[in-house]
Amino acid sequence: MKFISPTIHGLIDYLVVVFLLTSPATFGFTGLLAGFTYVIGIIHLLLTICTEYKLGIFKFIPLTIHSGIELMMGVLLIVIAYTLFSNNSEGKLFYVIFGTVILLTWLFTDYKGIHHKKVETT
């Protein structure tokens, strides 16, 4: 069941940006782990503000493209956890969990808004 509406997904996206941009300070990340997390946060912010949904600002990336990017990023972040951060248990754990959360959000989002449109009565 796709129970996350496009609007709620937009809220989640902005919360993810805040989470990513505050994680290095909150969790004490340094070096590559901190830098990578900031870059991912900025990329996610750009994707979020450019997406064509209620909470987007510039609205030129279709929500279906946003969906595909999130699917790829979720998988890629888990792969990165085991490659780029293979010797950093903190980074590995962070990106396995974060990638999994991205994939679950992708899985449960109604990107077409089909289940969340108002039913018109005649």
Task: Describe the residue ranges of each PLM region.
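Membrane-helix boundary/interface segments in integral membrane proteins
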Residues: 46-59
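Hydrophobic alpha-helical membrane segments
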Residues: 66-81
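Membrane-helix boundary connector in multi-pass membrane proteins
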Residues: 79-95
